[in-house]
Amino acid sequence: MSTLHKVKAYFGMAPMEDYDDEYYDDRGPSRGYSRPRFEDDYGRYEGRDFEDPRRDPRAGMRADLRGEPADYPPPGGYRGGYPDEARFQPREFDRADMARPRFGSWLRNPTRGSLAMDPRRMAMMFEEGHPLSKITTLRPKDYSEARTIGERFRDGTPVIMDLVSMDNADAKRLVDFAAGLAFALRGSFDKVATKVFLLSPADVDVTPEERRRIAETGFYAYQ
């Protein structure tokens, strides 16, 4: 466009369709749907990328070539019904070697293994001539029976003190008395069970094993 035409167009002396400039787009809008000037390619996709691999038998082959796991079932469709056999079979625990022992067996054999003691040795501990053969068990009800304990121990008799039936205050006083008595007469004072103590004279040597056996085999039988 010449300079004259530009001047005419500027003052309205020339038709607008004759005005041509690189900054002006004289093309009118096209009829119908027009594609946006700035398109976003993120929304574009091809249908074959979203095909169900279960319907396409070639999808598993493509997954193997790409190194991707194909965790979908093979083609063939859904198989109804249940399998003939259960997948997990119940285990049987009714074997003879796993039978539970009877209650009486635990009472007859309270100790097993290395702690078990020969019954013959246990009988020898209380036979005539053994220091523990004259052992006695006292079950005081209150602190007033401390005199009886002291007299038995002074005569050289091992004494088992069962303080289970006493209250804690009197039991503590009697324990202090027995400990002082054993110290004065050069004896020994040992605990064999809960609130049960053994007073041994100086000439009676009671080993830890014997004390444990006294507690396990029933010191209540020795009065």
UniProtKB/Swiss-Prot annotation:
Q: Where is this region: Disordered?
A: 19-81
Record has Nucleotide-binding as a keyword: no
Looking up InterPro entries in the UniProt record yields: Cell_div_SepF (IPR023052), Cell_div_SepF/SepF-rel (IPR007561), SepF-like_sf (IPR038594)
Query: Where is it located?
Result: Cytoplasm
Q: What is its main location?
A: cytoplasm
| Gene3D superfamilies, per database record | SepF-like protein (3.30.110.150)
Q: Report any one BP term from Gene Ontology.
A: FtsZ-dependent cytokinesis
* CC annotations in GO: cytoplasm
List where Basic and acidic residues composition bias occurs: 36-69
Database matches in Pfam families: SepF
Q: Which domain of life is it from?
A: Bacteria
Alphabetically ordered keywords of this record: Cell cycle, Cell division, Cytoplasm, Septation
Family in the record = Belongs to the SepF family.
What is the role of this chain?
Answer: Cell division protein that is part of the divisome complex and is recruited early to the Z-ring. Probably stimulates Z-ring formation, perhaps through the cross-linking of FtsZ protofilaments. Its function overlaps with FtsA.
> How is the quaternary structure described?
Homodimer. Interacts with FtsZ.
Q: What is this protein called?
A: Cell division protein SepF
Q: Which organism is it from?
A: Mycobacterium ulcerans (strain Agy99)
